[in-house]
A protein has these predicted regions:
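Conserved donor NDP-sugar-binding/catalytic core segment of glycosyltransferases
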Residues: 99-127
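N-proximal low-complexity "stem/linker" segments adjacent to membrane-targeting elements
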Residues: 1-22
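A conserved acidic beta->alpha catalytic loop
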Residues: 29, 35-47, 89
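Conserved nucleotide-sugar donor-binding catalytic segment
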Residues: 136-216
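Short, acidic, metal-binding catalytic loop of nucleotide-sugar glycosyltransferases
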Residues: 21-30
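Short aromatic/hydrophobic "clamp" motif used to bind/position activated sugar donors
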Residues: 85
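Glycine-rich, basic loop-to-helix element that forms the pyrophosphate-binding segment
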Residues: 63-80
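Catalytic core of nucleotide-sugar-dependent glycosyltransferases
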Residues: 193, 197-200, 206-236, 259-263, ...
Length: 274
């Protein structure tokens, strides 16, 4: 079973090779990577110059500059050939056992996810986990998923692929996972940290304006869940998602207040109690 991996690339010249090297190090070698340029840059030439060009790599472009990771991922869907799909940001990496660990569960349940290890890009040091690490396999329903304070990057079967919602950039991964869980019922979550999530102070999600942008996004999503189309969710899922976004919005507002007193405070430190 081939797993396709979509990698949006925006100003990724200094980090894409690390992401690709982590795929080449997988203990399961049956994968395809779709690199989606979202900045007009020729990443194929970059990879070729680095001596890493191979048949498992496909290069496409959004034809735009900074259209957003949600749009880039949707463009990448048109190039996948695998029976399963997962995501990898160009500035992140997978540990070698990720496919080996998640693929059997995805075959059985439709999808599976692992925990993220958050890493400071500047120092290379792991950051405190935002949640306590469980010791066994969990099956998250939507209410349990909405209690998490860190992203999840699932691997799922092609039959469960859905396009990302256009125009939803902030917390767009949360929306995608809500729709996935609504579709499959529960999401298996292994206790291993197999996805290394590098945090840059300059990234959109960690900029000084992020709290305001997240607050507005959460308000918009809640309104859509309460009296809009509900993103196509069933009634129970709409209620769980609405309650979850209300919690996330309150947490984001508390973090913004804490940052006013302590500007250097990171979200990871805030939610982990450090």
């Amino acid at each position: 079973m081939t797993t396709s991996v979509i990698i949006p690339a925006y100003r990724a010249q200094d980090c894409l090779m690390r992401a690709l090297a982590s795929l080449r190090a997988q203990t399961i070698t049956d994968w395809q990577a779709v690199i989606v340029s979202d900045d007009g840059f020729d990443y194929r030439a970059l990879v070729e110059a680095a001596g890493m060009l191979e048949g498992r790599l496909v290069f496409v472009s959004t034809g735009r500059i900074g259209s957003g990771c949600h749009h880039a991922r949707n463009v990448g869907l048109g190039a996948i050939s695998g029976d399963a799909l997962s995501w990898l940001d160009a500035d992140d990496e997978w540990l070698p056992q990720r496919l080996e660990t998640l693929l059997p569960l995805a075959r059985q349940h439709g999808a599976a996810a692992d925990l993220l290890q958050c890493v400071d890009e500047q120092t290379g040091q792991p950051l405190p986990p935002s949640q306590g690490l469980e010791t066994g396999l969990q099956h998250l329903d939507l209410a349990a998923f909405m209690q998490l304070d860190q992203p999840l990057v699932p691997l799922f079967l092609r039959e469960h692929v859905q396009e990302r919602i256009e125009g939803a950039e902030m917390a767009e991964d949360v929306l995608a996972n809500i729709r996935l869980i609504d579709r499959i019922g529960t999401l298996p979550l292994v206790p291993q940290q197999l996805y290394r999530y590098f945090i840059r102070a300059s990234s959109l999600a960690h900029s000084e304006q992020a709290e305001d942008r997240f607050d507005q996004a959460y308000a918009d999503y809640m309104a859509r869940l309460d009296h809009g189309d509900g993103f196509g969710l069933g009634p129970a899922s709409r209620r769980a998602a609405l309650a979850g976004f209300a919690r996330k919005r309150a947490l984001n507002q508390a973090y913004a207040e804490a940052r006013r007193a302590k500007p250097a405070l990171t979200f990871q430190d805030f939610v982990s109690g450090h």
